[in-house]
Amino acid sequence: LFPEGAISRNGHLGEFRRGFELACKNVNDDVVIVPFYLRGLWGSQFSRSSNKLKTLRRSGYYREIIVAFGQAQPKTSNATTIKQRVFDLSVQSWQKHVENLPTLTDAWISSVRKAERRKLSLADGISAPLTADKALAAAWCISRRIRRLSPEQNIGLLLPTSTGGVLCNMATLLAGKTIVNLNYTANAAALTAAIEQAEIRTIYTSRRFIERLEKKNGDVITVLQGKHIIYLEDLRSEIHFNESFWRWLAIRVLPTRILKRVCNHTHDSQQTAAILFSSGSEGLPKGVMLSHQNIMANLKQISDVVNTQEQDVL
């Protein structure tokens, strides 16, 4: 029995109708109610999710479906009680699902392979717009240099929200490193504390961005003194057309599994992907370590709630 009485329009539990309570009144005394929950059908071709989400969730010949059963309940249980038991099962099945999520980089590579070849992926009004495959090729080129120039695990990034910022973040993850995005609006004490706590020795930034910061927040410049500063403009000048082309071609022709092996150095979803620091407004900033699994779980949750439409832009 499906007490909601209809297919979900949002992927979440709806109101439980009380018809099953009446159905259970006239059955034998040994009858029980076994709550169960289905996870993994939202985004399938038979769900009422958006066409965009169905495309994003397309997984070839198989998809992960979890069927979770709970403890048998008395036949006298009401709709509120049974819904709570089903809700508990939804939480348990979600936790099980999260255990099998890929790393951020593996998920990104998979999405790039599914993306339309000529469709815009990144644009900021400053840099040239990029398609998904060109964005991955650029990040791949940068990641090789990050691995060569920065042997340490935690990498500091001082960049605005931009195409370059996105590429540097993803390149750092492709290199198997941990991202530490520094808050350029914070004061010198907060920035220094964050850099020391994360044991950051190398900071990637942009000359153009630093020139702007000098006019707005001089504290940032003093904090950078003594650190190994690498400018994205310098990395970009090292990347020649041939390198970009061959990496782009590999992205287009290599099987996804092989592509993940050759360009991605992060394969453990429990590895720390990013360290986020508080603003430091109430004392020294506090760092929160987020694994690939943590962030992927949040991405999946947001995707389910938003039910992405074709015209949506972030």
Kindly give the residue locations of the regions a language model identified.
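A cross-family acyltransferase "interaction/gating" segment
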Residues: 6-77
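Conserved structural elements of the adenylate-forming
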Residues: 21, 25, 135-142, 255, ...
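AMP-dependent adenylate-forming
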Residues: 106-131, 149, 273-276
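Conserved pre-ATP/AMP-binding loop-to-beta segment of ANL
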Residues: 116-118, 229-277, 284, 304-313
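Conserved AMP-binding/adenylate-forming core of the ANL superfamily
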Residues: 120-149, 153-170, 187-192, 250-253, ...
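Conserved AMP-binding A3 loop
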Residues: 128-134, 265-267, 273-297
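Conserved S/T- and glycine-rich ATP-binding loop of Class I adenylate-forming
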Residues: 155, 172, 203, 272, ...
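Structural core segment of the AMP-binding/adenylate-forming
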Residues: 174-248
